[in-house]
Amino acid sequence: MGQKSNPIGLRLKIINTWDSLWYANKDYTTKLHEDFLLRKFIKKAFYHASISKVVIARKVDVIMVNVYSAKPGVIIGKKGADIDKVKQQIVKMINNNIELNIIEVKKPELKAVLIAENIAQQLEKRISFRRAMKRSVQSCLKIGAKGIKVSCAGRLGGAEIARTEWYKEGSVPLHTFRANIDYGFSEAKTIYGIIGVKVWVYLGDTKSSNE
């Protein structure tokens, strides 16, 4: 039986690169756990800022954190008050100097993580899963995606038995390595239980970094 691998991990060093840009020897596990903590903290602190990814690069005396957000104003706050507050909390948490950069995501409708989070938020507001999926798919294709596939799994519509529903438009070639496919996952916490939302977005073919 075929298994679905993560399209981003499958294409690392072909068309994608890592979100953690550093090398470590003895204290690798410590730094890895720090990265997990940083991402979890930033995502939680700015839940409504539509964060697509957090890239962490480590230098000798400073950690550079690039936050890609569709709503940078939510993170920065009035006169940068919110971002300074978060910086202080992170420094206290990991005991290291930090440089926090906010990068705006120009087309959030094409980011799989943001699409998944948007669908999850709609499901939490009791909007029909079919309507939420269809709306997100149409807006994604309108912006310029070549194809999109969405799955919702769980007690959909409050059903007794959990099931998985799919919605697909266009082509999503998961087995083509040069295909630029973005993948995102989110969870909707409803009164019936958790519903998992997965999104694959095909943005067209890309030349590999080795060519």
Swiss-Prot record:
Give UniProt keywords alphabetically. Ribonucleoprotein, Ribosomal protein, RNA-binding, rRNA-binding
Q: Which PROSITE patterns match?
A: KH_TYPE_2, RIBOSOMAL_S3
Q: Domain KH type-2 spans what residues?
A: 38-106
- Residue ranges annotated as coiled coil are none
Q: Name one GO molecular function term.
A: rRNA binding
Q: InterPro entries of this UniProt entry?
A: KH_dom (IPR004087), KH_dom-like_a/b (IPR015946), KH_dom_type_2 (IPR004044), KH_sf_prok-type (IPR009019), Ribosomal_S3_C_sf (IPR036419), Ribosomal_uS3_bac-typ (IPR005704), Ribosomal_uS3_C (IPR001351), Ribosomal_uS3_CS (IPR018280)
**The UniProt record lists the keyword Cell membrane:** no
One Gene Ontology CC term in the entry: cytosolic small ribosomal subunit
- Return the Gene3D superfamilies for the record: 3.30.300.20, Ribosomal protein S3, C-terminal domain
Q: Name one GO biological process term.
A: translation
Record's NCBIfam families?
rpsC_bact
Q: Which family does it belong to?
A: Belongs to the universal ribosomal protein uS3 family.
Q: How does it assemble?
A: Part of the 30S ribosomal subunit. Forms a tight complex with proteins S10 and S14.
Per its database record, what is this protein's job?
A: Binds the lower part of the 30S subunit head. Binds mRNA in the 70S ribosome, positioning it for translation.
- The name of this protein is Small ribosomal subunit protein uS3
- What organism is recorded for this protein? Ehrlichia chaffeensis (strain ATCC CRL-10679 / Arkansas)
